[in-house]
Amino acid sequence: MPKRTDLKSVLVIGSGPIVIGQAAEFDYSGTQALRVLKEEGLRVILVNSNPATIMTDPEFADATYVEPITPEVVEKIIAKERPDAILPTLGGQTALNTAIALDKNGVLEKYNVELIGANIAAIELGEDREKFKGVVERCGAESARSHIIHSMDEALKAAEDLGYPMVVRPSFTMGGLGSGLAYTEDDLRRIVGQGLQYSPTSEVLLEESILGWKEYELEMMRDKNDNVVVVCSIENFDPVGVHTGDSITVAPALTLTDREYQRLRDISIAVIREVGVDTGGCNIQFAVEPDTGRVVVIEMNPRVSRSSALASKATGFAIAKIATKLSLGYTLDEIPNDITQKTPASFEPTLDYVVVKVPRFAFEKFPAADPTLTTTMKSVGEAMAMGRNFTEALQKALRSLEQKGSQLDFSHVPEWEVPELIEKAKRPTTERLHQVQRALLGGATVEQLFEATKIDPWYLDQLQLLNEISHEIRKSTALTPEMLQRAKRHGFSDEQIGALTNNQEAVVRGVRQALGIRPVYKTVDTCAAEFAAYTPYHYSSYDEEDEVALHSKPSIIILGSGPNRIGQGIEFDYSCVHASMALRKAGYETVMVNCNPETVSTDYDVSTRLYFEPLTLEDVLEVIAAEERTGGVMGVFVQLGGQTPLKLAQQLADAGVPILGTSPEAIDLAEHRGAFSRVLDEAGLISPKNGTAVSFEDAKKIADEIGYPVLVRPSYVLGGRGMEIVYDEPNLSRYIANATEITTEHPVLIDRFLEDAVEIDVDALYDGTEMYLGGIMEHIEEAGIHSGDSACVLPPITLGNNVIERVRTATLAIAEGVGVRGLINIQFALASDVLYVLEANPRASRTVPFVSKATGVQMAKAAALIGTGVTINQLRSAYKMLPETGDGSTLPFDAPVSVKEAVLPFSRFRTPEGKVVDSLLGPEMRSTGEVMGIDKHFDTAFAKSQAAANNALPTEGKIFVSVANRDKRSVIMGVKRLSDLGFEIVSTGGTADVLRRNGIQATPVRKVAEGSSAEGEGTIADLIVAGEIDMVFNTPSGGEARIDGYELRAAATSIGIPCITTVAEFNAAVQAIEAQRTYEWSVTSLQEHAENLKALQNG
């Protein structure tokens, strides 16, 4: 059946900001979908609030709306654009929930818009826990015994029937948000309380505990002719009880018998038919009781999901692309497989390799959080690896994480430690895999560990096998070919072999290469080599036959950014993808090396060739060698993927690899305190007084000289890792004592902390003679809050022309002095009209996508071409990639205003007592993603950014105000304005007195520390939890007030109301609230903004 001809325009709803549980995989899916829709000749409209996505690049849609994804805003877009259909299955839970709300509000009917890809009935059946239970029963399958509840009383009644422990799962949430395991009534009250609040329908499922069962997923697709394919089976290494996003997962499933697999397949096909998913994909999760084989259906997602991205990358089967074609009316047998070009999509993929995904966590950013893994997802990223066997894929995946201690440790385990390791392994944490492997190494049996962890004995055997090989390596008297070949086939790195044989990594590599033991590169072809593959998508293995084809011209290799983490996220992938696009258009062959299954960069058609490999020196050198053998390498880009490839720059150069763009020497100069200070001195620029310390005595001396407060941090970090503002000597002593590594090579950097300064961020391009300044961003929060967590605005709204000119001159002097070729990011602080240079990063920064979207200039593409020798002058005239005159510092006065806001994951992380971790911002970055608000004026743009970040500002109600003494004078005008607008102001003690003295009516409330009164009057935290407060404004102070502040910020975070912790953000919020009350929001596409900006610049 050919595609439908009645559809002329389609609105795609994106997933918004990167949050835990809903990350870059939806940009990958969405980008594929937009390409398909455009190829099919449809007018494409997109709404997505995340500027760091490839899908929001203006060329991917006809009208791109970077607006909040709320039913109200999407209705405005529908009213303006009048699409024929909405595709809601590629934007995660956000898009599905928005589509359901638009249907319930009557908007779809009002504008005669239909949903494609999934109908409302199918979404409801798949997502509504009670209805889905009925579906499973009608299919003759089994669900866990359960009760649906809508109140706490119902939950307590259900507990009498189900008994403890039990699983709590809210409806219509993603990433297991609000779910958990209740072992006691206290647990039940706490988790159900959260669940009722997080579920948009206030519906929660309580089910019998199936802890310790094996967990599987099947990724399915179905078309309107009832053709069904199973794309991939996925198995969780961890048993039920750990969210699948936090578990190590393996594809294909390795421990199912043929009969068991057939049973899961039959149930899945029956369920997908009964639910009615007939134009797209879904995934279905199962639990299997290891002793009896009893199968229970856990849940389904009637949409493209995190698992779909993993299954796509694992098999080469483009799920999102094919799902989009199905939604337009095609059938599976009409859609060709891109990779083989001979088989249709109705052929199920076959794998002749093993894929392992491992999650990456960020507990170091939230020291107070409980690291136990539960049904609520907590990982911030993931790495994937492929191998010819499980052990090879596992070891490659672990080293892809790039975390200290992520590789397996084969050093001696004393006997006394084994019982302790077995005991620790009973509780699922990020360390469990290592505890299990070490316990086995120390002599524990597979039976003991199966009893403790319920991890399948087959996997425990595989860990035992790795331990045995490590013994063989240790016993080996020399680096023999037999030993090296066996070790390599099971994924041991040169570094691990070196540690076991007391050799340097470089020595092992030298011997291995001299013996001719090199990896070959296999191809992901969807069909186990039954048909030829036309897309070069490779993974390494120590096998026989190399499958890298000869290429006619030297390649340019782009090193990606590895797994997402806090501080290095999708923004860096954006720059890598843009570089590949620009270089391919300019006629180069590009090679992408990356190991992140969520991203656009690891899509098989973004580059000429893709290598799915860890970003370690060993793995990257082998990819370069493979490219050299088959046609040569022009050079490697390390400046686009963040700190991961940057760390390899010098070692690659030492190995004779040509580095494109900024040289390793220039990269080092910018990171090196002394050398960089000389660049500033020559340019007549100043930085805050600073010093480097290798001991506490050093640190104390420097801090005394420059005066407290000081900012202390380790050298060579991204995302403010380990950074802290220290106000006195005792705290400095504590920081130095806790610094993991402080040596001459890794000193601690100490800077004077500039209080009350305005922070400024600049992204610029430099080609050796000319600079193009991309954009000047003014931070809304004061200095001291990490730039990645601070809201910022472009163009700047309070900086005069004189300051902008000084920033421009300083940027040029630094770019020249460092010797940049391509992108540079510089952070300044303006304090008492003195401009200080805080730091310079000669690489793509996390603000590049935001600046590109705000100004309509794609900077990463320009940087890539500069790296190949193109000048800024040529980029202006011949390539038309930069404006003919002027740059981002000369934006017209009435240019649109863009606000970038950070999205923070505090609601995911709880202390062992079940409280949310503190939401206070500081110099260490904690945000997982970002959104953008764009409008004619700052106040509305800021309001949009808050709504997009799920932090919508109230337009009426009660506002709680409690600020530190130093801030009381600064907040009076803002609070008075809110009071005049009709808000009720609620305040504690001292703040209430100050407000009343200034003529502001403030209702006093009890502090947390005071507790409830004898008459039963609750504290401010009680009022927040009861939903009586609409916004919290609290700046931190010391002593008892600090504890008070934490309690009320935690209460605000847990019920999801705005919680503002800085004066600057409060003042911006007051402006935004007033704007929301005064003006009707309008929606404008990026394409319209670009046209308007061009007209202003030319006019």
Swiss-Prot record:
| Any one Gene Ontology molecular-function term assigned to this protein's record | metal ion binding
| Residue sites binding Mg(2+) 3 per the record | 827, 839
Q: Report TM segments.
A: none
An example GO CC term for this entry is: cytoplasm
Q: So what does this thing catalyse? A: hydrogencarbonate + L-glutamine + 2 ATP + H2O = carbamoyl phosphate + L-glutamate + 2 ADP + phosphate + 2 H(+)
Q: Which Gene3D superfamilies match?
A: 3.40.50.20, ATP-grasp fold, A domain (3.30.1490.20), ATP-grasp fold, B domain (3.30.470.20), Carbamoyl-phosphate synthetase, large subunit oligomerisation domain (1.10.1030.10), Methylglyoxal synthase-like domain (3.40.50.1380)
Q: Single Gene Ontology BP term?
A: glutamine metabolic process
The family line of this record is:
Belongs to the CarB family.
Function in brief: Large subunit of the glutamine-dependent carbamoyl phosphate synthetase (CPSase). CPSase catalyzes the formation of carbamoyl phosphate from the ammonia moiety of glutamine, carbonate, and phosphate donated by ATP, constituting the first step of 2 biosynthetic pathways, one leading to arginine and/or urea and the other to pyrimidine nucleotides.
Q: What is the protein named?
A: Carbamoyl phosphate synthase large chain
Give the gene name: carB
